Amino acid sequence: MIILLLIYNLLALPIIISLSIIFSIFNKKIRKGFLGRLRSISSLKSFNSEKFSDIYWFHSSSYGEYQQVETLIHKLKKSDPNIGIIASFFSPSGFDNVKDDNIDLKIYLPFDFILTSYKALKLIKPKKIFFTSSDFWPSFLFVANNLNITTILTSARYRNSYKIFLNMFDIILCVSENDCQLMKRNIRNNKITVTGNPRYDRILNNLNNAKYKIKSDIKEKNKILILASMWREDNKIIFEDLIDSSLINHFEKIIIVPHEISQKYINYYCSSFEKRNFAYKVIDNYQNFEHLAEKFIIVNRVGFLSKLYLQTSITYVGGGFSKSGIHNIIEPAAASNPVIFGPNFLNSNKLDAQGLINVSGGFSIESFNVFKE
């Protein structure tokens, strides 16, 4: 393990950081993350951790992963308002879009060198560190273990390639009994338990608190299609053929939510509609679709996608034509939407996808022609 960490710190990380510097010149998202990590230690130095009884550090890769621990953070703060919560992120989608009064400090996770991780953890001295899903970093974990800081993995799923990292956690909270049994058979840890998928609690809470809901009979009559978490591949295979087909006439409205909210993608959708003289509207706040005259709606903000499903009748979830795999399909299913997605669902959402397919609530497609059917 020590040898692997040395190779990682002395060879792999410098190469990764060098490439990040180069790519950041051309990619705004990479640049924001890189500059944010440069400021992380300074932010930790300025943070007054002494005024809190204990510090709990939560790390999530992105906005979606943070939502999986959001309920836990709220419960911790409610049970003891004197504790401090630090939330760290890898992606700008998490850092920029998570706005939660329960968080006392929000940062990018510092560069994963052993010395940097040691400096960060000695400054804060957290009582516990929570990692969400699969975004865990070797040096940070190693240092936490050596400083006797309790490390907890939430929303855990077993993958053999993660085995070396899974052995570094003190407590592992699995999303399913199957994952739990695989963990117990393959790693050295007796503190493994099933807590279920925390996304479900959050989904139900969002649905219950949604302001705008359309009754099921109206949803069925006035069909509203939502294309959610759309990647470039989804645009090429589904979106472009859809807007050139007669299928659009079957829908009262069509909502488009890009996976990455950026001006580049918004301009792409706007241009596509303008070329065809289609009326469209770009929205950046949660609102009632019934009050919008335009047929095509482009969503230009994250944070309320799960609530939009209550106003739609059919959902296409993107990612299934890309290497990353499909995104959250439970949210639209919970809102009684049939869910359509591409062929690549062998990621962390595999069990959800297969479960929906088995009960005819989900449909995997390989082309737009199948989508039309």
Model-derived regions: residue spans:
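Helix-enriched interaction subdomains in cytosolic or periplasmic regions
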Residues: 1-33
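Active-site and donor-binding regions of nucleotide-sugar-utilizing enzymes
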Residues: 20, 24-207, 226, 230-232, ...
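Donor-nucleotide binding loops and adjacent catalytic segments primarily
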Residues: 75, 81, 86-90, 95, ...
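Anion (oxyanion) recognition and catalysis
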Residues: 77, 145-146, 274, 333, ...
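Short acidic active-site motifs
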Residues: 116, 161, 265, 300, ...
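Acidic donor-binding loop of glycosyltransferase active sites
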Residues: 124-128, 292-324
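Hydrophobic beta-strand scaffold residues
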Residues: 149-151, 280, 339
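Catalytic binding pocket for nucleotide-activated donors in carbohydrate/polymer assembly enzymes
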Residues: 169, 310-373
